[in-house]
């Protein structure tokens, strides 16, 4: 599937321009007070960071195991034609890396 670059750039530029204009057309500025902020910062909000998903992505047996990492990416992106990437296929060894 080929995506024409110029129309995509024009559409993205229009979207950015539209959002920038919408931001400038907003109402009057609010005062910044402590009541405007949440009681806890987002840095400590575990659903916001999704730490459990990050931990599951870096299991001890698959971390820096390039074969397992490549297979994981292939499972996450099944819609790509992986035979079109012979260089990546050639870089993989026949056996998984010894950790």
Curated annotation (Swiss-Prot):
Gene Ontology, cellular component aspect: extracellular space; lamellar body
Residues spanning the signal sequence: 1-22
Major localisation: secreted
Job description of the protein: May act as a soluble regulator of keratinocyte differentiation. May play an important role in embryonic skin morphogenesis.
Protein name as annotated: Keratinocyte differentiation-associated protein
Subcellular location: Secreted
Keyword Secreted: yes
Spans through the membrane: none
Tissues expressing this chain: Highly expressed in skin and detected at lower levels in thymus. In skin, found exclusively in lamellar granules of granular keratinocytes and in the intracellular space of the stratum corneum. Also highly expressed in oral mucosa, tongue, esophagus, and stomach, and at much lower levels in bladder and uterus. Not detected in gastrointestinal mucosa.
Keywords: Differentiation, Secreted, Signal
A single BP term in Gene Ontology: epidermis development
Induction summary: Up-regulated in situ in psoriatic skin (at protein level).
């Amino acid at each position: 599937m080929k995506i024409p670059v110029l129309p995509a750039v024009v559409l993205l530029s229009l979207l950015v321009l539209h959002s920038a204009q919408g931001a400038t057309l907003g109402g009057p500025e609010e005062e910044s007070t402590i009541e405007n902020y949440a009681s806890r910062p987002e840095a400590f909000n575990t659903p916001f960071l999704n730490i459990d998903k990050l931990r599951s992505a870096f299991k001890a047996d698959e971390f820096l195991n390039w074969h397992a990492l490549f297979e994981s990416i292939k499972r996450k992106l099944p819609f790509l034609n992986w035979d079109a990437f012979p260089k990546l296929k050639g870089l993989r060894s026949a056996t998984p890396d010894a950790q």
